[in-house]
Swiss-Prot record:
Superkingdom of origin organism: Bacteria
One annotated GO molecular function: catalytic activity
Full protein name: Uncharacterized protein MT2054
Gene3D superfamilies noted in UniProt: Phosphoenolpyruvate-binding domains
Signal peptide: none
Induction: A member of the dormancy regulon. Induced in response to reduced oxygen tension (hypoxia) and low levels of nitric oxide (NO).
Entry-linked Pfam families: PEP_mutase (PF13714)
């Protein structure tokens, strides 16, 4: 089954988002066959805020590090780190991944949808096999956060060649159903509080990305593990050291032969 096919199964597939090799290996150990990256996790772990075009080089390095894994990889490239469509297309070619996420906002503001569409056109012309997931940030930024504006933007991106549309924080079931009815390609969401994967499937959602939830949960768990040690409390569950080490040894052996 191709990465494109995963979006047409009739039920949503879950795409966990990694920020480094160990997180990706953890997802593989759980049986996931496709892994995305989280721009927040990558930027945050490097000491940078999200969305500030600070992870261009880090994403190239991460894509290369994940390439030997037996799974599909999709990379979140924020807004493409540029306003020049051809430069973004060249950047995507360097990643050599099954898919990418590109958002229609920059510096926490929506950009002209014509520019966002031009970026998609350039990416698909240069990389026709790459699954382009066009992120519409209307709900995320609470700017023009309504179905009409969101659908208008989404249709421009589909016409430009987008293979999927990502609408983070579009959490109202009725609005989600309207979006999936009117956007003629697979629609991607983040987890929606109170709705199961099956519920989202009934609303027409094709893909559910974990986003930065696992990264944030990891930070929470790390802080509370340290507090448990300090307070003399029972330590939380964790992956055994030996298992983590074995994963990394296997990864190192695999990469040394590629």
């Amino acid at each position: 089954m191709s990465f494109h096919d995963l979006h047409h199964q009739g039920v949503p597939f879950v795409l966990p988002n990694a920020w480094d090799v160990p997180s990706a290996l953890a997802y593989l150990a759980e049986g996931f066959t496709a892994i995305g990256t989280t721009s927040f996790g990558v930027s945050s772990s490097g000491g940078h805020p999200d969305g500030h075009r600070a992870t261009r080089g880090a994403n190239i390095a991460l894509a290369a590090a994940l390439a030997p894994l037996q799974c599909y990889v999709s990379v979140d490239i924020e807004d493409g780190y540029s306003d020049e469509p051809d430069a973004i297309a060249d950047y995507v070619a360097q990643l050599s991944t099954a898919g990418i996420n590109i958002e229609d906002s920059s510096a926490e503001k929506l950009i002209d949808p014509a520019l966002a569409a031009a970026k998609i056109v350039a990416i698909k012309q240069r990389n026709p096999e790459v699954f382009v997931n066009a992120r519409v940030d209307t709900y995320w930024l609470r700017q023009h956060a309504d179905t009409t504006s969101t659908i208008q933007r989404a249709l421009r991106y589909v016409d430009a060649g987008a293979d999927g549309v990502f609408v983070p924080l579009a959490n109202d079931p009725d609005e989600l159903a309207e979006l999936t009815r009117n956007i003629p390609c697979p629609v991607n969401t983040l987890p929606v509080p109170g709705l199961t994967i099956a519920d989202l499937g009934e609303l027409g959602v094709a893909r559910v990305s974990t986003g930065s939830v696992p990264y944030s949960a990891g930070l929470y768990a790390a802080a509370h593990a340290a507090r448990a040690v300090s307070d003399g409390e029972q330590l939380p569950r964790s992956v055994p050291y030996a298992e983590l080490q074995a994963r990394l040894v296997d990864y190192e052996n695999r990469t040394s032969t590629t």
